[in-house]
Amino acid sequence: MMVRVMRYKKVPVKKIVNKIIDECDVILLVLDARDPEMTRNRELEKKIKAKGKKLIYVLNKADLVPKDILEKWKEVFGENTVFVSAKRRLGTKILREMIKQSLKEMGKKEGKVGIVGYPNVGKSSIINALTGKRKALTGSVAGLTKGEQWVRLTKNIKLMDTPGVLEMRDEDDLVISGALRLEKVENPIPPALKILSRINNFDNSIIKEYFGVDYEEVDEELLKKIGNKRSYLTKGGEVDLVRTAKTIIKEYQDGKLNYYKVDLKKYGQDRERDISFITKYLKDFPFIEDAKMIVTHLKDFDGLYKKIKKPVLGSEEIDGNIVVVSFGEKTKDACRKKVENLCRERNIEVLSKFGDKIGANNIYVAVGKRVKE
């Protein structure tokens, strides 16, 4: 018996875009709220308006941007602008109502809605948030959504998803926006420097606080400092600039690094603060100033090997030193970030630090002194 397998038919992007403009009544242009200008397509906007279609600007990832900045963007894009966070399901109700209102203004009880935008701005995630179901394929890799798909918003309103709309322009911007897959980029250093330069121009304190480095210029020397801070070294002991650059791009795309300061007090809000079950093993430990020796010492205790249910982040004063511990995060790098942010929050000068794994738990320890203001 022969089984027929249904496969997605790859449809040219331009053909799908033209189909959206021709067939849909309302078109959602999805932009990255962190940098809307970089992710907009003015040529497409003009074409949509020339066809007499309703255009709604959807600024996704708005939860990463301060409210006063969003208000400035609304002045730029006008009243047909909606701020959403598809990931957190924020603003989607307002978007649904704006779609219905747009159709009503057109005198239509039924209608079709098209969604366009660059890869990784969140088109498919917005569809999922609007419909309440995972009806469209989603992913962080550029070009995952394939072909043409219709999904139902209401009984009378349908949405059509589309692959990212690409135009020939600066290759660095294509890398930054996610339109070009990072693993295929031969030289990630220029786009990484472009991200750092934009952030530096917006607020030059953000890079210093996020990476914990001092710098004068945005150049390869800054990349070296960041790479050294992250311990991204080659076998020869040199800073791995390619890995450093790719990390900067990835963390920007993931929303970890952006134009706006993170509230450090909120960074560890879901973490237990009681680390006494760890520090009890450090009483009378003679090398408390050495973070690496602390971690090595803790490996001797079986009670720390079982996977904990909830990550822990906290600090404790031992023999005149402040010991900061992050324990149980998904990665060692996540532990490191928690520790560094807590040290900044509590004004602790770090003298030694080290991360490793104890059984099923990642751990990162920093030892320092509290700086008097």
Curated annotation (Swiss-Prot):
GTP binds at G117, Y118, P119, N120, V121, G122, K123, S124. Residues 14-168 form the CP-type G domain. It comes from the Archaea. PANTHER family: GTP-BINDING PROTEIN-RELATED, GUANINE NUCLEOTIDE-BINDING PROTEIN-LIKE 3 HOMOLOG. Pfam families: MMR_HSR1. InterPro entries: G_CP_dom (IPR030378), GTP-bd (IPR006073), GTP-bd_ortho_bundle_sf (IPR023179), P-loop_NTPase (IPR027417), TRAFAC_YlqF/YawG_RiboMat (IPR050755). This is Uncharacterized GTP-binding protein MJ1464. Belongs to the TRAFAC class YlqF/YawG GTPase family. GO terms for molecular function: GTP binding. The lineage of its organism: Archaea, Methanobacteriati, Methanobacteriota, Methanomada group, Methanococci. CDD domains: MJ1464. Gene3D superfamilies: 1.10.1580.10, P-loop containing nucleotide triphosphate hydrolases (3.40.50.300). Keywords: GTP-binding, Nucleotide-binding.
